[in-house]
């Protein structure tokens, strides 16, 4: 099931690369590094003191949980109801009752969150919702231009119409000005 999810996630190679790396356990955790170099310290790199397993570093750690709580908060604003299960964002294994359109929207949101977690992989700080929103906007912009180029604008609209409004409402005016953020769908 995860392989099917990998093949249809996005046309963007950067997004597909991130999804492949997380699904295939590309990132080395402190537990795996301890086994490789025979050191005794397998604690989480985020600095929480827990054992740094793959699931802990990507999902369970107290420094990563606020980001995932924000992602699920956005899902609720979109009226998408999902269990807070790490198999969904990390492996792309969705419950059977989730529509394809919702899966596409969720996958994009999850991949943006995974990007942010991976970017600060060994830094002892919490990934911020602002960074996540900026990554979402970057993905949105790239998919917009890809949809125009490939004449697939209707699929783009289905995926991004509601999500664009929520992202724009959460970004502050200074963020919008500094990152040149404006609606690509409505042209405002």
List the model feature ranges, each with a label.
Residues 1-188:
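Family-specific functional microsites
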């Amino acid at each position: 099931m995860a392989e099917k999810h990998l093949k249809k996630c996005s046309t963007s190679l950067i997004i597909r690369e991130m999804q492949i790396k997380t699904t295939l356990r590309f990132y080395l955790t402190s537990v795996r590094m301890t086994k490789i170099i025979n050191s005794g310290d397998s604690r989480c790199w985020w600095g929480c003191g827990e054992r740094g397993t793959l699931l802990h570093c990507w999902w369970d750690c107290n420094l990563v949980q606020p980001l995932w709580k924000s992602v699920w908060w956005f899902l609720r604003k979109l009226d998408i109801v999902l269990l807070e299960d790490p198999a969904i964002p990390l492996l792309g294994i969705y419950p059977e009752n989730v529509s394809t359109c919702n899966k596409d929207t969720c996958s994009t949101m999850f991949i943006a969150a995974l990007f942010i977690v991976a970017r600060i992989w060994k830094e002892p700080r919490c990934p911020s919702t602002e960074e996540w929103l900026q990554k979402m906007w970057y993905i949105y912009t790239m998919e917009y231009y890809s949809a125009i180029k490939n004449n697939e604008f209707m699929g783009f609209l289905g995926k991004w119409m509601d999500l664009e409004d929520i992202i724009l409402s959460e970004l502050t005016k200074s963020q919008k000005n500094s990152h040149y953020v404006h609606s690509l769908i409505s042209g405002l």
